[in-house]
Amino acid sequence: ADGGAGWANPDNLELDDKGNLWMVTDIASEVLNQPVIDRDKVSNSSLRGIYSNNSAWFIPTSGPYSGQSFPFAIGPAETELCGLQFSKDQRTLFLTPQHPGIFNGRRKDMAFEERKFALKTTDGKEFFQVRKVPIGSNWPSKEPNQPPRSSIVGVRRKNNKPIV
């Protein structure tokens, strides 16, 4: 998106009780975190490699920010976030990080690779970012060498008020 604030591959959608739209992305794990050294020499599809992980977004449908996208959550490595669902009292948003490690399996000995990305700031200036990209996943334990597992996560406010 212009200005560098965007997403690709929208997937599951949910509406909260105020009518706001919630959305998760589903970019294949083998496409994520693929080096982009020169943005002008790759296809638009290959630019999806600049995305690090799948994510959840909040999109207000009324008010001064109507139609703008706001990042809400970033999924663990090599997962897709899905199953967006609010509790009846709107105090919990459930997400399911699904099939962690689908591309590289279990992360062994905290393995990672350094990769370079040609990015742009929100005002269009180019810069390079170097990432340490995990190879595989240990979600949800986050303990070295543990097998990855799908899970359900509930997100709540510390003050126990509705999410929105």
Protein language model regions, located:
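Sequence/structural signature of beta-propeller domains
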Residues: A1-V164
